[in-house]
Amino acid sequence: MIKLGIVMDPIANINIKKDSSFAMLLEAQRRGYELHYMEMADLYLINGEARARTRTLSVEQNYDKWYEFTGEQDLPLADLDVILMRKDPPFDTEFIYATYILERAEEKGTLIVNKPQSLRDCNEKLFTAWFSDLTPETLVTRNKAQLKAFWEKHSDIILKPLDGMGGASIFRVKEGDPNLGVIAETLTEHGTRYCMAQNYLPAIKDGDKRVLVVDGEPVPYCLARIPQGGETRGNLAAGGRGEPRPLTESDWKIARQIGPTLKEKGLIFVGLDIIGDRLTEINVTSPTCIREIEAEFPVSITGMLMDAIEARLQQQ
C-alpha cells in the first residue's frame, strides 16, 4: 500500500468545492493509499533526519464533514512513499526551510511533489525567462528609470511583484498615467526590490488561462479566468470568473515546449498561466483549478497525477 503524505494549510479551513489538494486526497484514498496529513509546524529535523507528526485521515465529499483524523504518529518522513508539498504561497524563508527538511527525506527515497530543489530554483514569475520566446516583452529590474523607459516604449504595461499570488499588487499603467512613479516606488520599495514589467496583453479580456501539466504532459482542458467589471486581472481571488475550455493549438504548443523541462526538474504538477498565445507565469508551489476543470470535462486530472506518481515510484 502506498503511503502518501501531504503538507498543506489547515484542512479545517478549505473550500472543498474548489480545493485541488482535497481532490488529490480523494483520488489517493480511492486508490487505497494510506493518507498522512501534515502542516508546516509538524515537520522537523533531528540530527539530520527529517521527521514529522502526521495524522492519518480519511476524506469524503461532504460539505458538513469532509475529513476525519484516524490516528496520530511521529515518524521519519522516509517512511512515506510520496509527499505532496501543497502549502500555499507566500514563498518565504519558512517555505524554503521546509523544502530543506523535505529534501532530507527525498535523499532517503521518498518522492516529493514537487521536487524541493526545483521549488527553490523556479520562481513562478522569473522561471518564464528560460522560455522568453513564449512570453510577453518582460523587464525585471529595481530601476525606476528603466521601468519608465519600458512604459514609454510600450505605453500600456503591467507591473507586478515577484512574490505575489492571487493577483495581489498587480498594476496596469496606461499611456499618460501620472501614477507610474509612485507605483514603481511602491513595488520596488524605493529601488530595494525587484519587480516585473510586461507589455499589456489585450487578450486578457478573453481570459488568463490556467493550463495544468502533469509530469510533462498537458491536461487537454484549461480554466480561463475572465476579468470582471473593468478589472485587468483574471485571478479568481481577484473576482475573475472561471470558464473551463479545451486547449487551443497555441496552448498545446506552449505546454509541449515547456513540458520536458518541467519533467526533468521533477516538477510533476505545474500550472502555466497563458494570456492569448503568451506565457506569463509557471506556477510550481501549489497550483489549483483541478476541480473547476474536472466538473466540466471528462478528465481525471488527479487520476493523471496519481498515475504519474505510481510510475515514478516504480522507476525508483
Curated annotation (Swiss-Prot):
InterPro entries: ATP-grasp (IPR011761), ATP_grasp_subdomain_1 (IPR013815), Glut_synth_pro (IPR006284), GSHS_ATP-bd (IPR004218), GSHS_N (IPR004215), PreATP-grasp_dom_sf (IPR016185). Its cofactor is Mg(2+); Mn(2+). Pathway: Sulfur metabolism; glutathione biosynthesis; glutathione from L-cysteine and L-glutamate: step 2/2. The keyword Nucleotide-binding applies. Glycans are attached at residue 256. Belongs to the prokaryotic GSH synthase family. This is Glutathione synthetase. Mg(2+) binds at residues 281, 283. It catalyses: gamma-L-glutamyl-L-cysteine + glycine + ATP = glutathione + ADP + phosphate + H(+). It comes from Escherichia coli O127:H6 (strain E2348/69 / EPEC). It is an enzyme of class 6 (ligase). It comes from the Bacteria. Residues 125-310 form the ATP-grasp domain. One of its GO terms (cellular component) is cytoplasm. Binds 1 magnesium or manganese ion per subunit. GO terms for molecular function: ATP binding; glutathione synthase activity; metal ion binding. Pfam families: GSH-S_ATP (PF02955), GSH-S_N (PF02951). Keywords: ATP-binding, Glutathione biosynthesis, Glycoprotein, Ligase, Magnesium, Manganese, Metal-binding, Nucleotide-binding. Signal peptide: none annotated. Gene3D superfamilies: 3.40.50.20, ATP-grasp fold, A domain, ATP-grasp fold, B domain.
